[in-house]
Amino acid sequence: ELEQRERDQVLVQFANRSCSVLVATDVAARGLDIASLAAVINVDVTPDTEVHVHRIGRTGRAGETGLVLNLASMKEMGYVGKIEQLQGRESEWHKLDELTPAGDGPLVPPMVTLHIQGGRKEKIRPGDVLGALTADLGYTREQVGKINVNEWSTYVAVDRAIAAQAASRLNAGRIKGKSVKVRVLED
Protein backbone atom coordinates (compact mmCIF):
# COMPACT_ATOMS: atom_id res chain seq x y z
CA GLU A 1 0.00 0.00 0.00
CA LEU A 2 1.48 3.34 -1.08
CA GLU A 3 1.01 6.61 0.75
CA GLN A 4 -0.63 9.36 -1.34
CA ARG A 5 2.71 11.17 -1.85
CA GLU A 6 4.33 7.96 -3.11
CA ARG A 7 1.36 7.23 -5.37
CA ASP A 8 1.55 10.74 -6.85
CA GLN A 9 5.28 10.35 -7.50
CA VAL A 10 4.80 7.00 -9.26
CA LEU A 11 2.06 8.45 -11.46
CA VAL A 12 4.26 11.45 -12.34
CA GLN A 13 7.12 9.10 -13.24
CA PHE A 14 4.84 7.02 -15.46
CA ALA A 15 3.35 10.07 -17.19
CA ASN A 16 6.87 11.49 -17.66
CA ARG A 17 8.08 8.28 -19.37
CA SER A 18 10.49 7.66 -16.46
CA CYS A 19 8.74 4.37 -15.72
CA SER A 20 7.92 1.92 -18.54
CA VAL A 21 5.30 -0.21 -16.81
CA LEU A 22 2.66 0.66 -14.22
CA VAL A 23 0.78 -2.11 -12.44
CA ALA A 24 -2.46 -0.81 -10.97
CA THR A 25 -5.56 -2.19 -9.32
CA ASP A 26 -8.98 -1.47 -10.77
CA VAL A 27 -9.40 1.24 -8.11
CA ALA A 28 -6.16 2.97 -9.13
CA ALA A 29 -6.86 2.54 -12.84
CA ARG A 30 -10.07 4.57 -12.56
CA GLY A 31 -8.17 7.63 -11.36
CA LEU A 32 -5.52 7.65 -14.08
CA ASP A 33 -5.50 10.26 -16.84
CA ILE A 34 -2.32 9.72 -18.81
CA ALA A 35 -1.90 10.88 -22.40
CA SER A 36 -0.39 8.65 -25.09
CA LEU A 37 -0.80 5.39 -23.20
CA ALA A 38 0.48 2.72 -25.61
CA ALA A 39 -1.10 -0.34 -24.02
CA VAL A 40 -3.38 -1.60 -21.27
CA ILE A 41 -3.01 -5.20 -20.12
CA ASN A 42 -5.84 -6.65 -18.06
CA VAL A 43 -5.07 -9.72 -15.96
CA ASP A 44 -8.77 -10.38 -15.62
CA VAL A 45 -11.98 -9.35 -17.35
CA THR A 46 -14.22 -7.11 -15.27
CA PRO A 47 -17.76 -8.53 -15.00
CA ASP A 48 -19.22 -5.02 -15.42
CA THR A 49 -18.92 -4.38 -19.16
CA GLU A 50 -19.16 -0.58 -18.87
CA VAL A 51 -16.39 -0.49 -16.25
CA HIS A 52 -14.17 -2.71 -18.38
CA VAL A 53 -14.63 -0.57 -21.50
CA HIS A 54 -13.93 2.56 -19.45
CA ARG A 55 -10.76 0.95 -18.06
CA ILE A 56 -9.43 -0.04 -21.49
CA GLY A 57 -10.35 3.40 -22.81
CA ARG A 58 -7.17 4.66 -21.13
CA THR A 59 -5.36 3.78 -24.36
CA GLY A 60 -6.05 5.14 -27.83
CA ARG A 61 -7.54 8.44 -26.66
CA ALA A 62 -8.18 11.48 -28.83
CA GLY A 63 -7.58 9.74 -32.15
CA GLU A 64 -4.39 7.98 -31.04
CA THR A 65 -3.93 4.24 -31.39
CA GLY A 66 -3.42 1.88 -28.50
CA LEU A 67 -3.31 -1.80 -27.73
CA VAL A 68 -5.47 -3.64 -25.21
CA LEU A 69 -4.55 -7.13 -24.08
CA ASN A 70 -7.03 -9.09 -22.01
CA LEU A 71 -5.78 -12.23 -20.30
CA ALA A 72 -9.03 -14.17 -20.15
CA SER A 73 -9.91 -17.61 -18.82
CA MET A 74 -12.60 -19.81 -20.31
CA LYS A 75 -14.87 -18.82 -17.39
CA GLU A 76 -14.63 -15.15 -18.47
CA MET A 77 -15.66 -15.68 -22.11
CA GLY A 78 -19.23 -14.57 -21.40
CA TYR A 79 -17.92 -11.21 -20.18
CA VAL A 80 -15.69 -10.95 -23.25
CA GLY A 81 -18.70 -11.52 -25.50
CA LYS A 82 -20.58 -8.67 -23.81
CA ILE A 83 -17.58 -6.36 -24.27
CA GLU A 84 -17.40 -7.28 -27.97
CA GLN A 85 -21.12 -6.49 -28.34
CA LEU A 86 -20.75 -3.12 -26.61
CA GLN A 87 -17.75 -2.17 -28.77
CA GLY A 88 -19.25 -3.56 -31.97
CA ARG A 89 -16.21 -5.65 -32.88
CA GLU A 90 -14.72 -9.05 -32.22
CA SER A 91 -11.56 -9.65 -30.24
CA GLU A 92 -8.44 -11.14 -31.79
CA TRP A 93 -7.33 -14.24 -29.88
CA HIS A 94 -3.89 -15.77 -29.39
CA LYS A 95 -2.84 -18.66 -27.19
CA LEU A 96 -0.44 -17.56 -24.49
CA ASP A 97 2.25 -20.03 -25.56
CA GLU A 98 2.22 -18.55 -29.09
CA LEU A 99 3.28 -15.11 -27.90
CA THR A 100 6.98 -14.26 -28.09
CA PRO A 101 8.88 -11.36 -26.54
CA ALA A 102 9.65 -8.43 -28.85
CA GLY A 103 13.14 -7.96 -27.43
CA ASP A 104 15.62 -9.65 -25.18
CA GLY A 105 16.48 -6.75 -22.90
CA PRO A 106 14.75 -4.96 -20.05
CA LEU A 107 12.35 -2.09 -20.64
CA VAL A 108 14.50 0.94 -19.89
CA PRO A 109 12.52 4.17 -19.87
CA PRO A 110 14.06 7.02 -21.89
CA MET A 111 13.52 9.63 -19.18
CA VAL A 112 14.25 10.05 -15.47
CA THR A 113 12.18 12.30 -13.20
CA LEU A 114 13.84 14.87 -10.97
CA HIS A 115 12.05 16.07 -7.83
CA ILE A 116 12.64 19.73 -6.98
CA GLN A 117 11.69 20.91 -3.49
CA GLY A 118 9.83 24.05 -4.41
CA GLY A 119 6.68 24.74 -6.34
CA ARG A 120 3.93 27.31 -6.82
CA LYS A 121 4.34 28.57 -3.24
CA GLU A 122 7.86 29.66 -4.25
CA LYS A 123 6.43 31.09 -7.51
CA ILE A 124 8.23 28.48 -9.64
CA ARG A 125 6.76 28.02 -13.12
CA PRO A 126 7.56 25.41 -15.80
CA GLY A 127 9.40 28.07 -17.82
CA ASP A 128 11.69 28.80 -14.87
CA VAL A 129 12.73 25.14 -14.69
CA LEU A 130 13.16 24.88 -18.45
CA GLY A 131 15.25 28.06 -18.43
CA ALA A 132 17.47 26.79 -15.63
CA LEU A 133 18.12 23.56 -17.52
CA THR A 134 18.58 25.05 -20.99
CA ALA A 135 19.78 28.65 -20.73
CA ASP A 136 21.67 28.34 -17.43
CA LEU A 137 23.00 24.76 -17.65
CA GLY A 138 23.19 24.32 -21.43
CA TYR A 139 20.97 21.28 -21.93
CA THR A 140 18.81 21.14 -25.06
CA ARG A 141 15.01 21.42 -25.09
CA GLU A 142 14.94 17.85 -26.46
CA GLN A 143 16.66 16.59 -23.29
CA VAL A 144 13.89 18.04 -21.11
CA GLY A 145 10.45 16.46 -20.95
CA LYS A 146 7.26 17.14 -19.06
CA ILE A 147 7.39 19.62 -16.17
CA ASN A 148 4.77 19.43 -13.38
CA VAL A 149 4.66 22.24 -10.83
CA ASN A 150 2.63 21.46 -7.71
CA GLU A 151 2.05 23.59 -4.64
CA TRP A 152 5.22 22.55 -2.78
CA SER A 153 7.25 20.60 -5.33
CA THR A 154 8.14 20.35 -9.00
CA TYR A 155 8.80 17.29 -11.15
CA VAL A 156 10.77 17.46 -14.38
CA ALA A 157 11.55 14.62 -16.77
CA VAL A 158 15.03 14.69 -18.27
CA ASP A 159 16.87 12.41 -20.66
CA ARG A 160 18.24 9.38 -18.80
CA ALA A 161 21.80 10.14 -20.00
CA ILE A 162 21.90 13.53 -18.22
CA ALA A 163 19.75 12.85 -15.14
CA ALA A 164 22.42 12.51 -12.43
CA GLN A 165 24.47 15.40 -13.80
CA ALA A 166 21.39 17.63 -14.21
CA ALA A 167 20.30 16.95 -10.61
CA SER A 168 23.78 17.73 -9.32
CA ARG A 169 24.08 20.91 -11.37
CA LEU A 170 20.60 22.11 -10.35
CA ASN A 171 21.51 21.50 -6.69
CA ALA A 172 24.61 23.66 -7.16
CA GLY A 173 22.73 26.31 -9.15
CA ARG A 174 19.57 28.33 -8.79
CA ILE A 175 16.03 28.42 -10.09
CA LYS A 176 14.48 31.86 -10.19
CA GLY A 177 17.41 33.17 -8.15
CA LYS A 178 16.87 30.70 -5.31
CA SER A 179 18.82 27.62 -4.27
CA VAL A 180 16.76 24.46 -4.51
CA LYS A 181 17.15 20.86 -3.41
CA VAL A 182 16.87 18.35 -6.24
CA ARG A 183 16.87 14.56 -6.16
CA VAL A 184 16.48 11.83 -8.73
CA LEU A 185 13.31 9.78 -8.24
CA GLU A 186 14.42 6.17 -8.30
CA ASP A 187 12.94 3.65 -10.72
What is the role of each PLM region?
Residues 1-187:
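Conserved helicase RecA-like core
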